Regions:
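Amphipathic alpha-helical interface surfaces
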Residues: 58, 79-83, 117
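Glycine-rich catalytic cores of cysteine/serine-nucleophile enzymes that process amide/ester linkages
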Residues: 14-77, 101-111
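A structural motif
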Residues: 76-100
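Short, Lys/Arg-enriched N-terminal segments with co-localized hydrophobic residues
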Residues: 1-10
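Activation targets extended, charge/polar-rich intrinsically disordered C-terminal tails
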Residues: 100-155
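Exposed alpha-helical structural elements
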Residues: 24-27, 82-86, 137-140
């Protein structure tokens, strides 16, 4: 049968967006993308998943998300199982420095040698062309969908 998931119900997937001061790299990303965010994570049942420069690539870990450094958007429409499966399948992927430069800075196609944070989150959410999303674009998209989705039918 079908289940109806309504906004405001307990969420198992969230998008966490880093707005803290961070490093010079964080500030450069925010400046280049004209966004308040320099990094993003998908939070699936309390574990943060992303591709991280600090951790060398795709990983999952439990970490604090203090409100002064992170904004969090509930994603009631997200398929937690598909997102988890994407991160499980890409757990050994390296951080995508080359793709970050090619796609985000130069607007070129990815070379497939690594994954950057917003690309990982967008791909895990099943969005088309995940390399086109920086943290700010992903935040805008997810916030829009969250505000305009009253219910989702899942079979």
């Amino acid at each position: 049968g079908c289940a109806v998931y309504r906004c405001g119900a307990t969420m198992s997937v969230q998008l966490a967006l880093y707005k803290g001061r961070g490093t010079l790299f964080n500030r450069l990303v925010r400046w280049w993308t004209r966004s308040p965010y320099s990094h993003c994570e998908l939070v699936i049942n309390g574990t943060c998943y992303s591709s991280s420069i600090r951790d060398g690539g795709v990983r999952g870990k439990v970490m604090a998300l203090p409100a002064h450094s992170w904004d969090v958007i509930d994603l009631p429409w997200a398929d937690e199982y598909a997102a988890q499966q994407w991160f499980d399948q890409h757990a050994c992927d390296k951080y995508g420095w080359r793709d970050l430069l090619l796609c985000q800075l130069l607007g070129m196609r990815r070379d497939g040698r690594g994954v950057f944070c917003s690309e990982a989150c967008a791909a895990a959410l099943g969005l088309p062309d995940p390399t086109k999303y920086g943290p700010g674009e992903l935040a805008t998209f997810c916030d829009y969908v969250a505000k305009h989705t009253h219910f989702i039918l899942r079979t």
